[in-house]
């Protein structure tokens, strides 16, 4: 099981196509920083032939921590992708809601002079 091979398949995560994977001090563990959020992926210390994926938000809270057996298996790999994509979608949706709320607020406070 090759950690880097699995990680390389996760590369197109950001909108601009860039990813900043870096190694951590733990053996066979890598992290991806997306804004203030960090995704860790590495070999599981609890399960044989498995990966641990942990998503940490900007203030250090663990958003999700999952163990996936043999991500080379297409079903497990798609679950791994879905987990990360769902997290990114939730973050994106949150920001879109904030933007929408601000626009609504501006519309209500704007006086139109005819």
Residue locations for each model-derived region?
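Amphipathic, interaction-prone secondary-structure segments
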Residues: 19-59
């Amino acid at each position: 099981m090759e950690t880097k091979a699995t990680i390389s398949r996760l590369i197109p995560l950001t909108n601009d196509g860039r990813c900043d994977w870096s190694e951590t001090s733990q053996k066979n563990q890598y992290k991806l920083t997306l804004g203030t959020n960090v995704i860790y992926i590495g070999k599981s210390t609890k399960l044989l032939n498995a990966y641990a994926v942990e998503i940490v938000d900007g203030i250090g809270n663990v958003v999700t921590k999952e163990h996936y057996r043999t991500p080379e298996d297409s079903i497990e790999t798609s679950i791994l992708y879905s987990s990360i994509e769902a997290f990114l979608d939730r973050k994106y949706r949150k920001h879109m809601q904030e933007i929408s709320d601000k626009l609504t607020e501006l519309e209500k406070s704007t006086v139109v002079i005819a």
